[in-house]
Structure formats: structure tokens, C-alpha cells
């Protein structure tokens, strides 16, 4: 590997990452995105490369994103191909606890802080996919959403298996997600007070 490098910052406008009003997510039970001992927690190009095959297959089946499970047991929810995962269970906001295979996303951090400031209880834990699907069916899980720099927050309408089994969320367009999104955008755009000193003014 090279012993020198050049640090560059590119600023460019971008279109919306996901434009659909009804987002369907494929539960990936075959492939693995990141393995223990690797670079799964880092923001590297290689992590995206590992998800491309599954993402292309999911797109062909009509899905917008892929939900990845842990590599070893395919039981614990990790993240989506380019975004972190959240779910609202009985009014409590849940997100997978960070591991060496889950990205410590900056948008994830911001949303946790915003949710706490808005009075929501936050739980970071190892979320089992089997338990979540049961909670969606019994309506104790009312919404799921994903977040990232490009997309900010995207509500999930359905979680789907390869065999066609689908699990529809009560709030397919988000409720808590909408509140968190509007708050974060308000801070970014200067309409709401930036109490966390997240925004830097460039002159």
C-alpha cells in the first residue's frame, strides 16, 4: 500500500437517494455485508462493494434496499446497504447496538440525540429479526426507518422475505421518523436552534 496520500473534500449537490413513497426492504438471509475482524464499522468503499450483488438482486425483485443480518448466525439486525436501522416498539425508539460490523453513522448519532431531546426513550440493543417480525405482526412495532447522510431519514413500508412473505408497518410513511426528519432538517437549514453546535458557518 502507498505510504502517502492526498486528502480531498468534494462538495456537490445530489438528488434524493430514495424517491419512492412506499419503500420495500428485502431481508438478506444468504449473503454477508461485513465480517468480524474486518472493516464493517468504517466508512470505506469496500463495505459498499460487498453489498452490490445483493442490492442488484433485491432491485430486480422490486425492493428499494437490503436489510443485513449478522454474518455468523443471520439472527441479529445490523444495518441496510448504505444506512442505519431504527424501529419504534411500543413508543420506544430502538436501534441495533454498535458492533465491529455496524457503521457508527453520523446521522444515526444525530437522530439519537434529537429523539432524546424530544422526550423519546432510546434503546440500543441486539435486535433479533425473528422478534421484530413478530412485533410488526402484533402491531407493537409501528414503524421502521433507515437513516444516512444522503437520505436523512426514509420510512420503511414493508420488510420482505425472498419467498414473497411481507410484513407491513402500521405507519408506512413514518410518524416518529417524520418528526425526527423535520427536526434535523430544521437544524441543518437554520430554522431551528442548533443546541448541539452541529452546524458550522463557512464565510
Q: Can you say where each PLM-predicted feature lies in the sequence?
A:
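Helix-start/capping segments and mature chain N-termini
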Residues: 1-203
